C-alpha cells in the first residue's frame, strides 16, 4: 500500500502563519503537524512509501522535512509546479498527478497534512481489510450547520455501506461527517483518471468518493476519538494551547 498525502494547498485562511510556511509544517507542541500523522502511518506495516504532493512554493520545505525524517516509510516529495490558487491542480488532480508520476499500481491511503487526530489508522486499515472495499472515515457531529458547511455528509446502511455522500451540502441529511482520509483498492486507483476525464470537480478530495459510491460499494469507518481540521488560526491556537497543557 502507498500513502498519498495532499499538501499542495496555500492555506490562505491561516495567514499570516502560512504566508511563508507550509501548513503541514507549522509547529504543534514542538513538532510539525505532519509528524503526528506519520506516527500513525508507521504502525501500518504494509505502507512502504508515502508520496507527498506539494505546490512549487513549499516544495523545498517538504523536501527538507523529508530529508530529516527518521522513520521506516520511504518518502517521495513531488512538485506539482503550481504557484497559486489560480493555477492549482486541485486535491483530486494532485491525486492523479501522484499516481502518474510514481506509476502507482497499488492500494492507496489518501490523507492531508493538516488534521490532528487521536484515533488509530491501524484500526481503520483493519476495517478496510474486513470489508474488502473502498473506505471513507468519519464520525457523528452535534452541530449540524457546521457539519453541512465544512464536511462531506454521509448516510449509511446497517452494514456501514454508504447510501449517500455529498461534499458540503449546505443542509445535512445525517449527522455523519467524513474527514479527508480515504482508502482505495488497486482497481479504484485506475478510476481517478476516469473521474477527471468526465469533467468532475478537481477540488475537495471528498468529491471522488461522492462519485464513486454510485458505481462501487464504499464503506464508512466510524472512528472513536478526536480529529481537528486545522483550517483557521483560531483552531490552530486552541489546539496548540490544549496540547501544551497536556504536555506540562
Please give the residue ranges for each predicted region.
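Residues at the starts of beta-strands that form the adenosine-phosphate
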Residues: 2, 48-50, 74, 107, ...
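N-terminal glycine-rich phosphate-binding loop and ensuing alpha1 helix
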Residues: 1-60
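Phosphate- and divalent-cation-binding pockets in alpha/beta enzyme and binding domains
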Residues: 13, 36, 61-62, 120, ...
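A residue-level structural signature of the nucleotidyltransferase/glycosyltransferase Rossmann-like core
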Residues: 51, 108, 116, 180-181, ...
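Conserved beta-loop-beta/alpha segment of the NTase-like Rossmann-fold superfamily
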Residues: 59-63, 67-156
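Catalytic-core segments of class I nucleotidyltransferases/pyrophosphorylases
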Residues: 125-129, 161-229, 233-248
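Structural beta-sheet core signal
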Residues: 5, 52, 110, 136-137, ...
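A structural signal for short hydrophobic beta-strand segments in well-ordered beta-sheet cores
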Residues: 25, 153-156, 220
